[in-house]
């Protein structure tokens, strides 16, 4: 992918990231996620088009509302940047397989863009509310179920008979998290994590799925210990943090680099 194409893909991803922010903030609030103009949460000023430009508007207005000067959450540019970079990774990952634009390239890439957009919504919503939104986890699971009939990321792209190994992987990961949820009565894990694990198993298969969950526990442990060490007044051994974002981060890492990580370790 050349530099210009990379810029176009990143900008497209940032625009999608801006929309994902809207979905995350309006989800379960009674507001429509597809209609209604964006406005400042403090003064209710309706935003003009140039105030909605991804990343640029945040920098230009110095992270403040142009009317009331209330601070704007860093979530906006961070999600826009992450989505832009993620779209770049997906396009590079796909382009190296197909080496040319084709129907299969477009279909496969579109599939992965939707999958990871949904995962971003789940991760950020869970981070804020410590609950995985049921609607979007089942959208992800539905998309992951499709991958049982077409991996969407191998050179011999094509629909096939049901992948029983990946189907079983989903149920194994689901059972593991459901067991943790049941044994702890929801203190260790939420049932939403089990539903998310179901889709991760279908999407990645058993090897990369286990790698994703292992990474999630490692990263979660590092972050948890760091939070306790850096802010003992706010966090303690009994503090709870959302695990969904770590599961999704592990999924992304395993999706892009799982084979290299597994071959390095084993």
Describe the function of each predicted region.
Residues 9, 111-219, 224, 263-266:
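Functional transmembrane core segments of multi-pass inner-membrane proteins
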Residues 90-107, 111, 153-162:
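Arg/Gly-rich low-complexity intrinsically disordered repeat tracts
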Residues 17, 193, 242:
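Short, conserved phosphate/pyrophosphate- and ester-handling motifs at nucleotide-, phospho-/glycolipid
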Residues 20-27, 62-70, 119-131, 178-188, ...:
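C-terminal ends of transmembrane helices
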Residues 20-75:
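Membrane-proximal soluble regions of multi-pass membrane proteins
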Residues 20, 24, 86, 90, ...:
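Alpha-helical membrane-inserting segments
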Residues 2-15, 87, 147-152, 250-266:
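Hydrophobic alpha-helical transmembrane segments
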Residues 226-253:
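Interfacial loop-to-transmembrane junctions
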């Amino acid at each position: 992918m050349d530099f210009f194409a990379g810029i176009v893909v990143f900008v497209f991803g940032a625009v999608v990231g801006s929309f994902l922010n809207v979905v995350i903030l309006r989800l379960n609030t009674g507001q429509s996620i597809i209609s209604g103009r964006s406005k400042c949460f403090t003064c209710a000023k309706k935003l003009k088009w140039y105030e909605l430009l991804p990343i640029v508007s945040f920098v230009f207005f110095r992270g403040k509302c142009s009317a009331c000067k209330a601070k704007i959450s860093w979530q906006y540019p961070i999600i826009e940047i992450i989505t832009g970079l993620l779209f770049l990774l997906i396009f590079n990952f796909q382009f190296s397989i197909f080496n040319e634009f084709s129907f299969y390239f477009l279909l496969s890439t579109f599939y992965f863009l939707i999958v990871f957009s949904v995962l971003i919504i789940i991760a950020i919503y869970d981070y804020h509310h410590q609950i995985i939104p049921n609607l979007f986890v089942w959208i992800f699971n539905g998309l992951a179920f499709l991958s049982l009939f077409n991996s969407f990321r191998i050179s011999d792209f094509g629909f096939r008979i049901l992948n029983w190994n990946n189907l079983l992987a989903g149920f194994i990961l689901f059972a593991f998290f459901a067991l943790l949820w049941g044994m702890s009565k929801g203190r260790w894990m939420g049932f939403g994590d089990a539903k998310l694990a179901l889709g991760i198993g279908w999407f990645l298969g058993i090897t990369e799925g286990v790698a994703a969950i292992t990474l999630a526990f490692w990263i979660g442990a590092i972050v948890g210990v760091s939070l306790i060490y850096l802010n003992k007044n706010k966090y303690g051994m009994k503090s709870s943090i959302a695990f969904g974002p770590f599961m999704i981060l592990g999924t992304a890492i395993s999706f892009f680099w799982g084979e290299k990580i597994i071959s390095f370790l084993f």
